[in-house]
């Protein structure tokens, strides 16, 4: 029984590290996918008020 404990503990430890790395990579991919949408929203927030002001100036 003692001879099996060390390899099983090592296997569990390596699997835990692997799972943690996979989670970090998946989170990074999700963040990369979310960024363009957030950038578009920021651009729209900056762009629309400027267009509104320009239209109001030309409309007068």
From Swiss-Prot:
The keyword Secreted applies. Residues 23-44 form a propeptide. Pfam families: FSAP_sig_propep. The keyword Signal applies. GO terms for biological process: defense response. Expressed by the skin glands. Residues 1-22 form the signal peptide. Antimicrobial peptide. The modification Phenylalanine amide is found at residue 58. Belongs to the frog skin active peptide (FSAP) family. Temporin subfamily. It is found in: Secreted. InterPro entries: Frog_antimicrobial_propeptide. Its main location: secreted. Keywords: Amidation, Amphibian defense peptide, Antimicrobial, Cleavage on pair of basic residues, Secreted, Signal. This is Temporin-MT5. One of its GO terms (cellular component) is extracellular region.
């Amino acid at each position: 029984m003692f001879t099996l404990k060390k390899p099983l503990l090592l296997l569990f430890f390596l699997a835990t590290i692997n799972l943690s790395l996979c989670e970090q990579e998946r989170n990074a991919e999700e963040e990369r996918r979310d960024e363009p949408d957030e950038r578009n929203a920021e651009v729209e927030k900056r762009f629309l008020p400027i267009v509104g002001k320009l239209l109001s100036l030309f409309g007068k």
